[in-house]
UniProtKB/Swiss-Prot annotation:
Probable toxin. Does not show insecticidal, antimicrobial and antiparasitic activities. Does not induce increase in intracellular calcium in mouse DRG neurons, suggesting that it does not induce pain. GO terms for cellular component: extracellular region. This is U-limacoditoxin(14)-Dv74. It comes from the Eukaryota. Expressed by the venom secretory cell of the spine. The spine is a cuticular structure containing a single large nucleated venom-secreting cell at its base. It is an independent unit capable of producing, storing and injecting venom. On the back of D.vulnerans caterpillars, spines are grouped together by 50 to 100 to form scoli, of which there are eight in D.vulnerans. Belongs to the limacoditoxin-13 family. GO terms for molecular function: toxin activity. Keywords: Amidation, Secreted, Signal, Toxin. The modification Arginine amide is found at residue 36. The keyword Signal applies. Residues 1-20 form the signal peptide. It is found in: Secreted.
């Protein structure tokens, strides 16, 4: 259960960083970044 929570937190962190980078410069169409938009 703890591993799942850590993985979810890491996933959310990466998606937030990706969306921030997307707003700042450009969206790299890789992995979950493309799904997120």
């Amino acid at each position: 259960m703890l591993k799942f929570i850590l993985a979810l937190a890491l996933f959310l962190h990466l998606t937030m960083e990706a969306s921030a980078a997307c707003k700042g410069k450009k969206c790299p169409p890789t992995g979950f970044v493309g799904m997120r938009g």
